[in-house]
Amino acid sequence: MASKCVRLLLLLSWVAGPEVLSDILRPSCASGWFNYRSHCYGYFRKLRNWSHAELECQSYGNGSHLASVLNPKEASVISKYITGYQRSLPVWIGLHDPQKNASWQWIDGSTNQYRPWSPRTKSEARHCTEMNPKDKFLTWNKNGCTKRQHFLCKYRP
């Protein structure tokens, strides 16, 4: 049986190409979540402060955290998804300054330095990051972590 499956996958990859095969082999995400490049994303239109949003992301399991957004392409995919639901409210992501010394870190441990800060962002007493709706969620603002707003979670299945 296993050899038949392998042959079928080889045949599919030869006939249909790698794009179709990657769709067939794509890991599944939880209901209501979307897939991009082997990660699952959940956008939640619930109002939570940054810490409670992170706890809620963790409660979904699978190593889920507030989302790390690591490059412009990923940001663009996320932007298009969120704007399908709303265009005016900021959305928490997982970048924060836990030591309150401008040492920004991703809550999931990612080390990428992609940081599209909005030129309008303010620094004082703002240690959590939101996606900025004024720029279609493609730039980010620093904001007070106690503000209650929508949030984006991410995990790798």
Swiss-Prot record:
Any one biological process term the GO annotation gives:
response to bacterium
List, alphabetically, the PANTHER family matched. Answer: MANNOSE, PHOSPHOLIPASE, LECTIN RECEPTOR RELATED
> Which compartments does it reside in?
Secreted
What domain of life does the native source organism fall in?
Eukaryota
* GO function term, MF aspect, one: signaling receptor activity
- Name under which the protein is recorded: Regenerating islet-derived protein 4
Q: Which Pfam families match?
A: Lectin_C
Instruction: Indicate the secretion signal residues.
Output: 1-22
From the record, give the cysteines joined by S-S bonds. Answer: C29-C40, C57-C153, C128-C145
Q: Give every C-type lectin domain span.
A: 36-154
Keyword field: Disulfide bond, Glycoprotein, Lectin, Secreted, Signal
Organism lineage string = Eukaryota, Metazoa, Chordata, Craniata, Vertebrata
